[in-house]
Amino acid sequence: MNICLFLPEEIGMPLALKDDRAEHILKILHKKTGDTFTAGIVGGASGTAKITGITDEGIFFDFTASGDGKPLYPLKMIVGFPRPIQLKRLLRDVAALGVCEVHLTGTELGEKSYMQSTLLEKGNAYKMLFDGTVQAGGTKIPGIFLHKTLSQCVSAVCGSRQENQADFSAPAAGKILLALDNVRPSQSLGDALGRFHGNLLSRGVVAAIGSERGWTDKERDFLAQSGFALCSMGCRIMRTETAATVAGAIILNEMGVMGNDERQN
């Protein structure tokens, strides 16, 4: 737990001793009255909390904001619904990277039963995103969305074909659309990103990653017709959650955000 996150209404209220955050503060960090710890407001500012007292009622603290909570980056990820255990790791990792949205979608080769997973119920998926955000020391939690089909997903995420393109000669206007595919790629992911000459951060990127069995030819055709460039990350076949994390890191590095020192946030 690299930051202790609170809802806005929790600021100014004692933190119950049985709360997981309180146990971390007292048993892991070994904090006592007068000490400080890194804290933040979910979706808001980050800063420092100073413990003003510890009683049976809980931990009393004062919060002082000092940072913006590490804003999320303009990278949206479309992911063919993976196995639930893979999805847990995927959500934690992409949240830690700072992806702004995760769109889970059914695919032609995807296992339909995965979409019925209880991971999407009772806030379990949100908890994975929350954990990844805390790991990164941020306060902004990525959005998560579920779509029955790839067509519905692309329509919801990308809008019209005219507003987005993978055309490298196109003006810096719409989102940059990239689909990971090791069967029929037109170029490598690195080459595709390199062609945008610094426009990645201003335009934003949508990266699509298939389920564990990949895309069908019909889906590849649909993605290409929708403006996605089919890109490879080499000849090695990766698990869905690995591909999502690796692709996210490569894209964010090309955006120029991976080298920025955000410790003050």
Q: Predicted regions span which residues?
A:
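Short Gly/Pro-enriched loop/turn and capping motifs at secondary-structure junctions
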Residues: 183-186, 212-216, 237-238
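Residue-level preference for the first positions of well-ordered beta-strands
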Residues: 176-177, 202-208
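Structured adenosyl-cofactor binding patch, chiefly the S-adenosyl-L-methionine
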Residues: 217-265
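N-terminal positively charged helical leader segments and presequences
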Residues: 1-68
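A C-terminal functional module that forms or caps the active site or interfaces directly
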Residues: 205-218, 222
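Short loop-to-alpha-helix "cap/lid" segments that border enzyme active sites
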Residues: 167-168, 186-199
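RNA substrate-binding interface of SAM-dependent RNA methyltransferases
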Residues: 69-178
